């Protein structure tokens, strides 16, 4: 178990712009932290600096209060799980899991005990004498996890470990990794580009873009209160809807539509000097409703929408529509038989909406 601190971490390669730019994060003991962001945002580079596989260009990294910038990877007491499993094809599952322990010249009885315990936790007991080619993708990933578990390290690092698996296996392995963390309580950093993995697995999420942290928070906080337009658009599937509009006192005008803004939000916008200015309004697809009782309650924030596309997804329908050429998606219940081309009255739950500065794209609060 370990507490980690990263203070003003930078990573420079040949380019002038840093690959990781002023990264600051405190990770408490037993946390499951997820770094999430698009390709090239610096999340894997940051993970590799934690592991000691990349040199920290500037800044300080601490494990349990000890600065470890110059400590070799093998001496950091960290176990890493990679995207490609990194298994030895000529070795059995048992030997793959035990390999790191044998290198450390651990006594055979202790190796046997640790491997068997890890195999039991991961459901690999009957596969210990098989070779990797005889295993499914999910089983191979379990072997890679087993190799990390037997190390009994202070910190687990996982670099997109599920990206090679199909969708069904990813869901299954997500649950297994969560259960594993609940059981072992090892401080974990997990890297992914998949926002669903971030939302379902993390104690806290670190959203990154262009080498910079955009937001740090619990999955609930990041989803419900995005720091900026990027976070709102990246976290959530479908993403948050965004509209450019102009604020008047009490209303936001989006083209020909005028939506009433709740007084609590209006007070903040008024105090910040946004009346008469263009802002960006954001709202989640599930906060746009078609139920009659909601439409009646929110008459002042309702519009008639022509349905361009209706996607049936079992118990819900994704409605694709527009307000004056600005696209939006609504997630509604599948109780109605809705078709493309139909017209539907929908209400925006303005209490759930957010306003962003049109220039900085930062949430106004």
Curated annotation (Swiss-Prot):
<dbReference type="GO" id="GO:0016887">
    <property type="term" value="F:ATP hydrolysis activity"/>
</dbReference>
<dbReference type="Pfam" id="PF03459">
    <property type="entry name" value="TOBE"/>
</dbReference>
<dbReference type="InterPro" id="IPR008995">
    <property type="entry name" value="Mo/tungstate-bd_C_term_dom"/>
</dbReference>
<dbReference type="InterPro" id="IPR047641">
    <property type="entry name" value="ABC_transpr_MalK/UgpC-like"/>
</dbReference>
<feature type="binding site">
    <location>
        <begin position="37"/>
        <end position="44"/>
    </location>
    <ligand>
        <name>ATP</name>
    </ligand>
</feature>
<keyword id="KW-1278">Translocase</keyword>
<keyword id="KW-0378">Hydrolase</keyword>
<dbReference type="InterPro" id="IPR005116">
    <property type="entry name" value="Transp-assoc_OB_typ1"/>
</dbReference>
<dbReference type="GO" id="GO:0055052">
    <property type="term" value="C:ATP-binding cassette (ABC) transporter complex, substrate-binding subunit-containing"/>
</dbReference>
<comment type="function">
    <text>Required to energize different ABC-type saccharide transporters. Part of the MdxEFG-MsmX ABC transporter complex involved in maltodextrin import, of the AraNPQ-MsmX complex involved in arabinooligosaccharides import, of the GanPQS-MsmX complex involved in galactooligosaccharides import, and of the MelEDC-MsmX complex involved in melibiose, raffinose and stachyose import. Is probably also part of the ABC transporter complex YtcQP-YteP-MsmX involved in polygalacturonan and rhamnogalacturonan type I import during pectin degradation. Responsible for energy coupling to the transport system.</text>
</comment>
<dbReference type="InterPro" id="IPR003593">
    <property type="entry name" value="AAA+_ATPase"/>
</dbReference>
<keyword id="KW-1003">Cell membrane</keyword>
<keyword id="KW-0813">Transport</keyword>
<protein>
    <recommendedName>
        <fullName>Oligosaccharides import ATP-binding protein MsmX</fullName>
        <ecNumber>7.5.2.-</ecNumber>
    </recommendedName>
</protein>
<dbReference type="GO" id="GO:0140359">
    <property type="term" value="F:ABC-type transporter activity"/>
</dbReference>
<comment type="subunit">
    <text>The complex involved in maltodextrin import is composed of two ATP-binding proteins (MsmX), two transmembrane proteins (MdxF and MdxG) and a solute-binding protein (MdxE). The complex involved in arabinooligosaccharides uptake is composed of two ATP-binding proteins (MsmX), two transmembrane proteins (AraP and AraQ) and a solute-binding protein (AraN). The complex involved in galactooligosaccharides uptake is composed of two ATP-binding proteins (MsmX), two transmembrane proteins (GanP and GanQ) and a solute-binding protein (GanS).</text>
</comment>
<dbReference type="GO" id="GO:0015774">
    <property type="term" value="P:polysaccharide transport"/>
</dbReference>
<dbReference type="InterPro" id="IPR017871">
    <property type="entry name" value="ABC_transporter-like_CS"/>
</dbReference>
<dbReference type="Pfam" id="PF00005">
    <property type="entry name" value="ABC_tran"/>
</dbReference>
<keyword id="KW-0472">Membrane</keyword>
<feature type="domain" description="ABC transporter">
    <location>
        <begin position="4"/>
        <end position="235"/>
    </location>
</feature>
<keyword id="KW-0547">Nucleotide-binding</keyword>
<dbReference type="InterPro" id="IPR015855">
    <property type="entry name" value="ABC_transpr_MalK-like"/>
</dbReference>
<dbReference type="InterPro" id="IPR012340">
    <property type="entry name" value="NA-bd_OB-fold"/>
</dbReference>
<dbReference type="InterPro" id="IPR027417">
    <property type="entry name" value="P-loop_NTPase"/>
</dbReference>
<keyword id="KW-0625">Polysaccharide transport</keyword>
<comment type="similarity">
    <text>Belongs to the ABC transporter superfamily.</text>
</comment>
<dbReference type="InterPro" id="IPR040582">
    <property type="entry name" value="OB_MalK-like"/>
</dbReference>
<keyword id="KW-0762">Sugar transport</keyword>
<dbReference type="InterPro" id="IPR003439">
    <property type="entry name" value="ABC_transporter-like_ATP-bd"/>
</dbReference>
<dbReference type="Pfam" id="PF17912">
    <property type="entry name" value="OB_MalK"/>
</dbReference>
<keyword id="KW-0067">ATP-binding</keyword>
<dbReference type="GO" id="GO:0005524">
    <property type="term" value="F:ATP binding"/>
</dbReference>
């Amino acid at each position: 178990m370990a507490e980690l601190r990263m203070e003003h971490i930078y990573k420079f390669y040949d380019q002038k712009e840093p690959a990781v730019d002023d990264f600051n994060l405190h990770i408490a003991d037993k946390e499951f932290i997820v770094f999430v962001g698009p390709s090239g945002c610096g999340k894997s580079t940051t993970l590799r600096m934690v592991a000691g596989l990349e040199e920290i260009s500037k800044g300080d990294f601490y494990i349990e209060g000890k600065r470890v910038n110059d400590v070799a990877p093998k001496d950091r007491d960290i176990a890493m799980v990679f995207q490609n499993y990194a298994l030895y094809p000529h070795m059995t599952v048992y030997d793959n899991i035990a390999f790191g322990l044998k290198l450390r010249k651990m006594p055979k009885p202790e190796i046997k005990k640790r491997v068997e315990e890890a195999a039991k936790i991961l459901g690999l007991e009957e596969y210990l004498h098989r070779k990797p080619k005889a295993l499914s993708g999910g089983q191979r990933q379990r072997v890679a996890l087993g190799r990390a578990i037997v190390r009994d390290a202070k910190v687990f690092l996982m670099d997109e470990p599920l990206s090679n698996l199909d969708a069904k296996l990813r869901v299954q392995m997500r649950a297994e990794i969560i259960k594993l963390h609940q059981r072992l309580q090892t401080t974990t950093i997990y890297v992914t580009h998949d926002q669903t993995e971030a939302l379902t697995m993390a104690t806290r999420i670190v959203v990154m873009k262009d080498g910079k942290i955009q937001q740090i928070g619990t999955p609930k906080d990041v989803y419900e209160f995005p720091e900026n337009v990027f976070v709102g658009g990246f976290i959530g599937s479908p993403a948050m809807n965004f509209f450019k509009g102009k604020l008047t006192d009490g209303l936001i005008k989006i083209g020909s539509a005028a939506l009433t803004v709740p007084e609590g939000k209006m007070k903040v916008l008024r105090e910040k000097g946004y009346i008469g200015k263009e802002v960006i309004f954001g709202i989640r697809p599930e906060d746009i409703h078609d139920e009659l009782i909601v439409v009646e309650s929110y008459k002042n924030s309702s519009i008639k929408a022509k349905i361009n596309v209706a996607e049936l997804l079992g118990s819900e329908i994704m409605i694709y529509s527009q307000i004056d050429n600005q696209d939006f998606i609504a997630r509604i219940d599948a109780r109605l038989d809705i078709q493309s081309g139909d017209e539907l009255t929908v209400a925006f739950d303005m209490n759930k909406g957010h306003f962003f500065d049109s220039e900085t794209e930062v949430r106004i609060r």
